[in-house]
C-alpha cells in the first residue's frame, strides 16, 4: 500500500467528523506530492514525513507504555491526527512561514475539523516551546504528553531523513 493510501486509511479510521473534507483538501492541495522545506526535500516528502512521524509517535508511545505500564495510552485517533496533520499547512505551499503549527491548526479549524485542546496544543507547538515561554498556553503545552510525543517524533523524522528520500 502506498503512503497516500496508508495516510488516508488511517485518517478515515479516526471516524472524526469532517475528516473527508480534510482528505479532499490534502488531495486538492498537493499534500501527497510536495516535499518538505527543510528535510524530506523531494516530491512526496511531506507525506513521507507525516507517515514517519506517525510511525515514530506510535513507537514512542509503545515504549512509554512498556516503561510505565500504569500510565494510560494516548488516544489512538488523537495520535494519528496530530502526527499526520502537524504540517498540514505545508500542503498549501506556505513554506518558511513562522508559526506553521498555528497555521496548520487554524486551517483544520477553517475546514470545520474540530481539534480537542490537547490536539490543538500538539499541532500548534509541535516544533518547540523554546520561543513561546510567554505564550498563555505554553504551560498547558508543556504538560501535554501528546504534544511531547508529536514533537519528539517530528524531530526524529526530520533528522533521520534530512535531504534524502526513504
Q: What is the predicted role of each segment?
A:
Residues 1-166:
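Metal-dependent phosphohydrolase cores
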Amino acid at each position: 500500500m502506498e503512503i497516500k493510501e496508508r495516510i488516508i486509511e488511517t485518517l478515515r479510521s479516526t471516524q472524526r467528523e469532517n475528516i473527508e473534507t480534510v482528505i479532499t483538501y490534502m488531495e486538492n492541495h498537493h499534500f501527497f506530492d510536495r516535499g518538505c522545506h527543510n528535510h524530506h526535500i523531494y516530491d512526496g516528502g511531506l507525506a513521507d514525513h507525516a507517515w514517519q512521524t506517525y510511525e515514530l509517535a506510535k513507537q514512542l508511545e509503545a515504549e512509554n507504555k512498556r516503561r510505565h505500564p500504569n500510565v494510560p495510552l494516548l488516544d489512538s485517533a488523537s495520535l494519528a491526527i496530530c502526527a499526520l496533520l502537524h504540517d498540514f499547512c505545508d500542503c498549501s505551499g506556505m513554506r518558511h512561514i513562522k508559526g506553521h503549527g498555528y497555521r496548520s491548526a487554524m486551517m483544520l479549524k477553517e475546514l470545520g475539523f474540530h481539534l480537542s485542546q490537547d490536539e490543538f496544543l500538539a499541532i500548534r507547538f509541535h516544533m518547540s516551546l523554546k520561543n513561546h515561554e510567554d505564550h498563555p498556553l505554553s504551560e498547558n503545552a508543556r504538560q501535554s504528553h501528546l504534544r511531547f510525543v508529536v514533537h519528539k517524533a517530528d524531530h526524529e523524522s526530520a533528522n533521520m531523513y534530512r535531504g534524502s528520500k526513504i
